[in-house]
Structures are given as C-alpha cells and as structure tokens.
Amino acid sequence: FFFLMIRRPPRSTLFPYTTLFRSGFDGEGQITSAITYVTSENNPKVYWVTGHGEASESDLSTNFSDAINKNNVEISDLALMTDDIPEDAEELVIMSPTTDFSEDEANKVITYLENGGKLLMFTSYTGTDMPNLDSILENYGVKRSSGIVVETDSQHYYPQMPYYLLPNIQSDDITTEVKSNYILMPVAQAIQKLDSYRDTITIKSLLTTTEDAYIENDPENSTWSKSADSETGAFDLGVSITETVDDKETQIIYFSSASMLSSQIDQAISGANSKLAATALTSMCDVEQTVVIPSKSTSYTNLVFTQGAVNTWSIITIAGIPLVLVVIGVMIWMKRRKQ
C-alpha cells in the first residue's frame, strides 16, 4: 500500500492512496482538508449524544460523514446518563433518538444551551411520546406535531409518496449552497411555534411546506386524503433558533426528519440533504474557514421528478404524443385522398 502524509510539526495526517478514488476522484478534497488540519491550532469538538437508540454517524450517508471529516471536526460519543457535558463541547448532536431522555438528561442539555451552547437536532416519527426530549425544544419556543406532514401540492412531494416531502427552501446562510437543489424529507413532523415564548428567542424557518399541506395524526391507518378536521397550512420542517442573553448566544438547528440523512434518500437527490446537514453542523462550531471540495464523481446524477412532473409527462406520453400522431396521420390521409 502507498500512503500520503501531510505534516507540519507537531501535527500530521496520513491516508492511503486508495481512499482518494471511490466512484470518483477525491484527492483535492482530502489533501486540502489535510493541509487545513496540520495548519490549524485547534479543531472543533462536537459530542454525539448516545444511549437512546440514536443513529450513529456510520448509519448515515457517507456524504455527510465525509463533509464533517473534511472540515476536521472531532466527534466523540456522549452518554448523558452517566456523563456531564464536557466544557470543551462546542456543539451537541442529537440524532433520531427512539426512546425518551430522562428528566436529568434533558436538564443537562437545557443547562448547556442556556450557557451559550449549540445543538444540531434531528428527530424521527416514532408514534410514542417523548416529553423530556420535547422539553428541550419547548424551552426554546417550538414543539413537534404528534403526526406527520402530508403534502397535497403535487409539485412538492416525491411521486406516489405524499409523505416524502420536497419542501420550499428559505433563504439563509445555512441553505445557500442547496438553494438550487431539492431537499427530500421523508415522514417529517411539523415544527410549530408555541403560543408564547421568551422575546429573546428568534425562530427562523429553513424548510417549509406549501399552504396545502396537512398533518396526518394516524399514519399507520391513513388513506392519505385530507379530512374536514385536518390541520392544514404551511408547516416548518427545519428551523434555526437563536437566543442571546448576557453576551451568550445559544443556537439550535432542528430538522424533523432524520431519514433525510439515510444513504438511499440522500443519493436520490445527489447529496443535497447531507450537504445541508453538514453546513448546519459546521456553521455552529469554530471551524476554520476553508474550501470543502467534494469528490469529482464519475457516476451519474439523479434526475428528480415531483408528482406534478410525473403527471405532466404521463399526459404528454399517453395522450399528447398519440394525438399528434393521429392528427398528422389524418392530414396525410386527407391530402392523399384529394390527389
């Protein structure tokens, strides 16, 4: 095996040449990241909360972990049941817990945030209540719906899956790099503002549905049709929350669909989900500004069709084209008949 070393005493990094080539060329990205690593004084430390059935970094799209690694973010596991949040924690990640936090664990997170902490949070619909986990969000002015969001605008959901949402992307520094892409959010819950919260809190929408969306409270038995008593409207699926008190700025970025980071979903939209998530993570910690160069892929790029696009092309191919051919045929027949 051959290895490439980037070294600037006392720091160095080493990786085999085989990692430069996957389904594309990644040499520029890895070398640029390595140079940044050896020339930086410190790398940000992010703690990944465990102990509640959370998804680990290895469970998610490799595009997400690659982007984190290229930013030289150091990630460590943190079991809140037994450990306090370390003083060097620049950010916490809560990734799709399947069981609730204890009250003590939730209070640890809230105390950390009240002292200027940062949190990147993804949740998944489980059908079970998690009051302690939800208390973290409610302390900062938002709650998640008990059901999932269903979209009825055919331009904003994946074909034949109205619960696989293609939300509107709002303008923000976090969303700039994906503004021209689709973001795919499967089985997402609505993020709703509380009726009252502290006036020091600012809640900004990142991803939103159309006004035609509704909340389905019983997705296991749903016919995916809106009823008269369905809660409808434009719902947030991703938000950025900030609060500044006594020169301490708390920041939370929350997305209500952890499935957006699965490899299959991320690949369906050519890595846009992982790019958004990685930008969200690095925006809240002290990452030295550098250019993250993605690998130059030799594979294909997926073409994403909404249900509306599928309907349009179906009409064109099933009715439009045959009709045109019939008209042309009739015109030719009439012309020959006159001759």
Residue spans for each PLM region:
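Short, surface-exposed patches at the edges or C-terminal ends of soluble domains, predominantly
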Residues: 1, 16-339
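Residue-level detector of conserved catalytic or cofactor/ligand-binding positions
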Residues: 5-19
